[in-house]
Design a protein with these regions (language model features):
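Functional cores that coordinate and move charged inorganic groups
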Residues: 1-100, 128
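Short N-terminal signal/transit or membrane-insertion segments
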Residues: 1-3, 89-105, 188, 192-201, ...
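Short N-terminal helix-initiation segments at or just after the protein's N-terminus
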Residues: 5-7, 119-126, 213-218
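Generic detector of short, locally flexible boundary/turn motifs and exposed helical patches
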Residues: 9-14, 22-28, 109-115, 143-147, ...
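Generic preference for hydrophobic/aromatic residues in regular secondary structure cores
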Residues: 18, 33, 41, 46, ...
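Feature captures C-terminal
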Residues: 38, 43-44, 127, 131-274
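A short C-terminal boundary segment appended to hydrolase-like catalytic domains
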Residues: 62-162, 170, 246-248, 267
Length: 274
């Protein structure tokens, strides 16, 4: 985030910590299969199967022993597609009751959308997609202010009947709704940080409004070029505010009032849903 943290600590370990033959990476959702040379001059295999189980890390290790000691080793790796292996009948039989229970739950109709909503407009301003999350958070929690971000980079819920499974397009993971007591200043500062991660400081109409990477992330040259992850791009509801993208961090956000027109105070404590 914002250049404050190591993006690829696993590669740093492979290159700078002697003693490893293989480093298995994960979490960053970018495929990797290559050998790097560490500071001791040894070869280290680095592998990352990315996400969703589409491929797995497949490694062959051949070791030659002499008098109980390793005299030679050959290490090779490939990313192997899982699709050709098909579905395990034994696995499906074992978990069929649980599968049926989940299918029944996620197939419940819970409403209807009169038009398709997408995360894409959320990066440029108010959007129906994020407004829905804000509305739900405020209504369910009774909070005064809501903070929410597009947790899925590019997704949509199509016009028509809406089912429980569609809600995973809103919030894909097991995130729970919480309320916190925050001062007005803390709300303001949280938004300042969000828009600093989200928006570029524009100096002319030709500048990008979004904060984009100068160079692709290592191992993900084909990825969209946000400098920071979109799930950090929090907007707020329950307040009326403006964002001036020509201003520096700390001066971008101006909170004008609460949504009902009553004054917003920096030193007042507010209940915030997130």
């Amino acid at each position: 985030m914002g250049g404050k943290y190591r993006e690829n600590a696993s590669l740093d370990v492979a290159r700078n910590v002697p003693g490893f033959d293989i480093v298995l990476m994960g979490h960053d959702h970018a495929r990797e299969c290559k050998k790097v040379q560490n500071v001791a001059g040894d070869s280290v295999l680095v592998m990352d199967p990315a996400s969703n189980g589409i491929v797995v890390s497949d490694i062959d290790i051949t070791v030659t022993l002499r008098n109980g000691k390793v005299t030679d080793k050959q290490i090779d790796g490939v990313l192997t597609e899982t699709a050709p292996y098909g579905i395990s009948g034994e696995f499906m039989k074992r978990f069929s009751p649980q599968y049926a229970t989940i299918q029944d739950f996620v197939s419940k109709r819970i409403g209807r959308f009169t038009k398709t909503v997408s995360t894409r407009p959320a990066y440029f301003g108010s959007s129906a997609f994020i407004d829905l999350i804000h509305t739900l958070q405020l209504d369910i929690s009774g909070a005064e202010i809501s903070l929410a971000a597009p947790l899925s980079y590019d997704t949509q819920i199509k016009e028509g009947d809406i089912y429980v499974y569609d809600m995973f397009n809103l919030y894909k993971y097991e995130n729970m709704l919480y309320t916190m007591k925050l001062s007005g200043k803390e709300v303001h500062d949280a938004l300042e940080m969000s828009y600093d991660l989200w928006t570029n400081r524009m100096t002319s109409p030709d500048d990008h409004i979004l904060l984009l990477r100068d160079q692709p992330r290592e191992g993900a040259a084909d990825r969209a070029a946000f400098k920071n992850f979109s799930f950090n791009f929090d907007s707020a509801a329950g307040i009326i505010y403006t964002v001036d993208v020509t201003k520096p961090c700390g001066s971008k956000v101006t909170i004008l009032s609460m949504a009902d027109g009553t004054p917003f105070h920096m030193d007042k404590m507010y209940t915030v849903a997130l």
